[in-house]
């Protein structure tokens, strides 16, 4: 059974391992840990007490910004990402958000399809948003909640 809980400090190392596993240009460890330390909302998904995914988001007034969401590859398409997204949307609504924003790599077709299943719409395209070894454009998406 999958369970969602708030991320705590003891989850950071495992969550960061998932980040490195699935993200072609993962956040630096410093930025990943700093996001938790500055108080961004962070939730994790577990299966039998094993951490298999996480979501990090910030809330400002009526806006939720999905900063990062990842599920270990062995759990892709098994409901963990959906449970994280459903929980994020529900928590955001409770906290007064009216809209969720995100940016996603233009070549990440699986993620774009996942977001479209939630009725996210494309708002804009940021050219050369992602730099480094895997440059890419960012698709800006939003969802009214």
List where the protein language model places each region.
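Conserved hydrophobic beta-strand within the GNAT/NAT acetyltransferase core sheet
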Residues: 66, 100-104
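Conserved catalytic-core motifs of GNAT/GCN5-like acyltransferases
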Residues: 103, 116, 121-137
């Amino acid at each position: 059974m999958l369970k969602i809980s708030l991320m705590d400090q003891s989850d950071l190392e495992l969550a960061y391992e998932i980040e490195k596993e699935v993200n072609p240009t993962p956040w630096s460890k410093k930025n990943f840990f700093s996001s938790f330390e500055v108080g961004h909302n962070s939730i994790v998904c577990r299966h039998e007490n094993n951490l298999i995914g996480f979501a990090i988001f910030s809330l400002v007034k009526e806006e939720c910004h999905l900063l990062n969401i990842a599920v270990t590859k062995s759990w892709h398409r098994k409901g963990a990402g959906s449970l994280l997204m459903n929980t994020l949307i529900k928590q955001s609504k409770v906290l007064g958000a009216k809209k969720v924003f995100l940016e996603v790599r233009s070549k990440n077709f699986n993620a774009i399809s996942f977001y479209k299943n939630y009725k996210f719409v494309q708002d804009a395209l940021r050219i050369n948003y992602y730099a480094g070894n895997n440059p890419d454009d960012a698709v800006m998406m939003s969802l009214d909640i």
